[in-house]
Curated annotation (Swiss-Prot):
Organism: Emiliania huxleyi (Coccolithophore)
Compartmental location: Plastid, Chloroplast
Family membership noted in the UniProt record: Belongs to the heat shock protein 70 family.
UniProt KW Phosphoprotein keyword: no
Cystine pairings recorded for this chain: none
Gene3D superfamilies recorded: 1.20.1270.10, 3.30.420.40, Actin, Chain A, domain 4, Substrate Binding Domain Of DNAk, Chain A, domain 1
Pfam families: HSP70
CDD domains, sorted: ASKHA_NBD_HSP70_DnaK-like
Protein name (record): Chaperone protein dnaK
Keyword Membrane: no
Region described as Disordered: 598-623
Main localization category: plastid
PANTHER family noted in UniProt: HEAT SHOCK PROTEIN 70KDA (PTHR19375)
GO cellular-component term (any): chloroplast
Length: 623
């Protein structure tokens, strides 16, 4: 069994980690960063961009840049009307399945396909770091994700070419990281406010046992919503000042979104942030600029309703765990949005103690996922994780009522059965409608699927005994079986189509991803070669400038000739030319370096530096 990685697939940023030498390690991506933006874009040429490089070009390519996709995964269009208004790309409704339109390619993507591109990049970065192909992962999801969203996340992993060994709740993963070395028993509350989702979990932690007592949350609340409040404020202010509605301009909206996120981050440490967006719009009179100062007090006023929404899940989790705030030993903050001072103050106010900020809120979830990956891979011993199902599961019964079979906060894996009967005489079959949620009426809960049990023996109503069994695995994914006790006939359903993607569609996406893997890798390598060549040109110019007084004219001319050719190759995307000329330029600069630093290198007894030494050295003038 190869290395199993832990992945935090976030709304705004994602992180991958692995167990090394018994300790979890966050893996740096190919750009040298520990977090990777969950952004995927396609250029006008059809090139795929993932991560920071995709985020950087979002302003000039908003219609083909996909972010915050986690808000759509496993959902139907009717469930995400608010989120649809917050993104500049087009979201299509096809048979109530969410599809993201990509004009650059002239095709549509499922949310799972976009998320798969992020997962594939994380897996590729992990492969480079470890020196072995990564094929297995533990992926985290918000604790309050329903069955559809969990299954959709597994589908995304499959499309990315990963075997998802376990889906684990984000707050639970955070607790694994926090409590890994804790010996004393503690009751902790994990407050996880990320880019797009919010969870609260209460756990008993100590001596290798992690037991979730209760979980609550809101999958429609996160940092994106705080950004949106600032965007709306800027739009309204600009409309009042200039009479121009910026919501009609996708590029302007993208610039506003990026400026809002920057201001939000600054207001975590400063009391005021200046927002300056020149040329945000153009009129016949000339260009218009947006200049506004946003104070922390105004920001908190704009977001007061969002901060208030953080209260209820805390109160619900305490109630379900049958605990008072004073029973909580530590409250651990997770997710980038917990850096907002008003959020920290709210948690302190509700629980009566300062939050524990000993963990990195951006990385702690991936680190915990790596610990769980280590458990599954046999690297980590003496860890017992007892997680729970976040929402009640049941069936629809007579009168459109939801009858709960597995209450929320039931420890998983679990298997529970209830016996039902028929509603009319000689009823030949029953339809089992599986539901998830806390509402009394079936129509108000999430429908996970239906199936029919045929061949019930004729009998008066109320006589047949139909046993319905709910089986929830360690990933929180459900299977339901109905059995007629008289005839032993049974029918079952695994709620696996809940991601809204048919099995053959998932298989098609997997196949398509595999077919494109080679070309995607080739394009990635081309970009890498181009970036290195571009960097080499810059460094060479800089070194020529610094060494100009020490260089012979012929040597300088020789280097500049190759440099000009390499710059032209970069301009023309000439891959082979870039490779050959880069090698030639490095060789020439090495020779120059030898002459400058060891002028007697060729003389008797002189020792020339090795080629490796020459490449690794930064040329600089001695002062």
């Amino acid at each position: 069994m190869g290395k199993v990685v832990g992945i935090d697939l976030g709304t705004t940023n994602s992180v991958v980690a692995v167990m090394e030498g018994g300790k979890p390690t966050v893996i740096t991506n190919s750009e040298g960063q520990r977090t990777t933006p969950s952004v995927v874009a396609y250029t006008k040429k059809g090139d795929l961009l993932v991560g920071q490089i995709a985020k950087r070009q979002a302003v000039i390519n908003p219609e083909n840049t996909f972010y915050s996709v986690k808000r759509f995964i496993g959902r139907k269009t009717s469930e995400v009307t608010e989120a649809l208004r917050q993104v500049p790309y087009k979201v299509l409704q096809t048979e109530d399945i969410i599809k993201l339109d990509c004009p650059a390619l002239g095709k549509q993507f499922a949310s799972e396909e976009i998320s798969a591109q992020v997962l594939r990049k994380l897996a590729d970065d992990a492969t480079k770091y470890l020196g072995e192909t990564v094929t297995q992962a533990v992926i985290t999801v918000p604790a309050y994700f329903n069955d559809s969203q969990r299954q959709a996340t597994k589908d995304a992993g499959k499309i990315a070419g990963l075997e998802v060994l376990r889906i684990i709740n984000e707050p639970t993963a955070a607790s694994l990281s926090y409590g890994l070395d804790k010996k004393d028993n503690e009751t902790i509350l994990v407050f996880d406010l990320g880019g797009g989702t919010f969870d609260v979990s209460i756990l008993e932690v100590g001596d290798g046992v992690f037991e979730v007592l209760a979980t609550s949350g809101d999958t429609r609340l996160g940092g994106d919503d705080f950004d949106e409040k600032i965007v709306q404020w800027l739009v309204n202010e600009f409309k009042n000042d200039e009479g121009i509605d910026l919501t009609q301009d996708n590029q302007a909206l993208q610039r506003l979104t990026e400026a809002a996120e920057k201001a939000k981050v600054e207001l975590s440490t400063l009391t005021q942030s200046s927002i300056n967006l020149p040329f945000i719009s153009v009129t016949p009179e000339g260009p218009k600029h947006l200049e506004k100062d946003l104070t922390r007090a105004k920001f908190e006023e704009l977001c007061s309703d969002l901060i208030d929404r953080c209260k209820t899940p805390i109160q619900n989790a305490l109630k379900d765990a049958e605990l008072s705030p004073s029973s909580i030993d530590q409250n651990v903050l997770v997710g980038g949005s917990t850096r907002i001072p008003a959020v920290q103050e709210l948690v302190e106010q509700l629980l009566g103690k300062k939050p524990n900020q000993s963990v990195n809120p951006d990385e702690v979830v991936a680190v915990g996922a790596a610990v769980q990956a280590g458990v599954l891979g046999g690297e980590v011993k003496d860890i017992l994780l007892l997680d729970v199902t976040p929402l009640s599961l049941g069936v629809e019964t007579l009168g459109g009522i939801t009858t709960k079979i597995t209450p929320r906060n039931t420890i998983i894996p679990t298997k529970k059965s209830e016996t039902f009967s028929t509603a009319v005489d000689n009823q030949p079959n029953v339809e089992i409608h599986v539901l998830q949620g806390e509402r009394e009426l079936a129509k108000d809960n999430k429908s996970l699927g239906t199936f029919r049990l045929d061949g019930i023996a004729p009998a008066a109503r109320g006589v047949p005994q139909i046993e319905v069994t709910f089986d929830i695995d360690a990933n929180g994914i459900l299977s339901v079986t109905a059995k007629d006790k008289a005839t032993n006939k049974q029918q079952s359903i695994t709620i696996s189509g809940a991601s809204n993607l048919a099995k053959d569609e998932v298989e098609r996406m997997v196949e398509e991803a595999e077919q494109n893997a080679a070309s995607d890798k080739e394009k990635s390598e081309q970009i890498d070669v181009k970036n290195k060549a571009d960097s080499l040109c810059y460094q060479t110019k800089k070194q020529l400038e610094e060494l100009s007084s020490k260089l012979e004219a012929a040597d300088k001319e020789k280097v500049e000739e190759v440099l000009t050719k390499l710059e032209l190759a970069v301009q023309n995307d000439d891959l082979e030319g870039m490779k050959t000329l880069s090698e030639e330029l490095q060789k020439n600069m090495m020779e120059v370096g030898q002459k400058v630093y060891t002028p007697d290198a060729g003389a008797e007894g002189g020792a020339a530096p090795s080629q490796d030494d020459a490449i690794e050295t930064d040329f600089s003038t001695e002062k």
